Amino acid sequence: MGLFSRGGEQRLTEELVMRALSTVQEPELGGDLVSRRMIKNVKIDGERVSFMVDLTTPACPLKDQIQNECIKAVQTIAGVAPENISIEFGSTVRPRGGVMDKAAVPGVSHVIAVAAGKGGVGKSTVSTNLAVALAQEGARVGLLDADVYGPSVPLMMGVSGQQPTAVDGPDGQPMIIPIEAHGIKMMSVGFMVEDDKPIIWRGPMVSQLLRQFLYQVNWAPLDYLIIDMPPGTGDVALTLAQSLQNVGLTGVVTVTTPQSVATLDVMRSIEMFKKVNVDLLGIVENMAYFVAPDTGKRYDIFGTGGAERLAQREGLPLLGQIPLGMSVRSGGDSGQPAVISDAPDAYAETFRQLARTLAARVSVMEYA
């Protein structure tokens, strides 16, 4: 029998509901939901109970588990029928903590860089689909294309040829209004140069441009700003990494393919970020394998296990493995990211799971 019976021996109260929910643990951060102040707006209406669970990210991968355990706790401890329990989910994405607060991009909770040790591993594909997947989960997301020598975000997001506008900011300085598509705010050097014109800039010029894109673009409010970094470990990549570290970068996600030549370059990239004291969030393996659409047979075109071995070596989580799919490629070419497609070889749910895993990783870093 619960804490109160159907006969009304003990009246249903907010206190009893909170006591029941205090037995539910936050599965990743530890501690119970009540102590972490994640339970809000408890309401009692006869035998009906409703409340909100304030998650640390709208892309929480364990939302279903939390909901089931809340229902079980209220049902078994408070004696309320499951059909009389109503749970709403909200989220409060905690801004990047620590000494970088003063330098943080105004209105942006987390700045996350997506990098690669070499070109051709699908870093921009991961960046765009990760950004859209986070938005699909309910997050407010921006995408900054910092790959100045190969800006592909305008094409991959279907906004080629568009140009951002500017307005006067509160301090009288011009503020750029980002281009928007698929629920994402975007900025790219590709909006400012012709497609067939070369971009011949050195590191300091690129760093200055990046700073302008961070502080003179009207990003706010954002939960996550995803930055598509230039590949490699050369002057430009190093300069950008140092610049981002100075503005409170939450961390970096590194993208690789399975083969050794790619993971070797990723190791160099990881070492570069370590040298400039940037937190490493994890590794994504792109083009992990190919499933033939006519036979269903799997082919490990670029080998297998490379990212997993690298993750174990570096003590980093393997955030996701994205298969090679024709719809992933065609979606990038057509400006329709794969994550919004229902084609089997678009692997939309795989991208969404990557987004949830990354969001959980950031939450653990900030709330633990």
Regions found by a protein language model. Name each.
Residues 2, 9, 14, 36, ...:
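C-terminal lobe/tail of nucleotide-utilizing enzymes
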Residues 35-38, 43-49, 56-115, 362, ...:
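Extreme N-terminal, non-catalytic leader segments
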Residues 2-40:
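N-proximal, solvent-exposed amphipathic alpha-helical segments enriched in charged/polar residues
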Residues 226, 245-285, 289-290:
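Helical hairpin unit composed of two closely spaced alpha helices linked by a short loop
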Residues 21, 39, 60, 74, ...:
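Residue-level signature of catalytic and energy-coupling elements of molecular machines
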Residues 134-196, 201, 207-211, 308:
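Phosphate-binding loop that captures ATP/GTP phosphates
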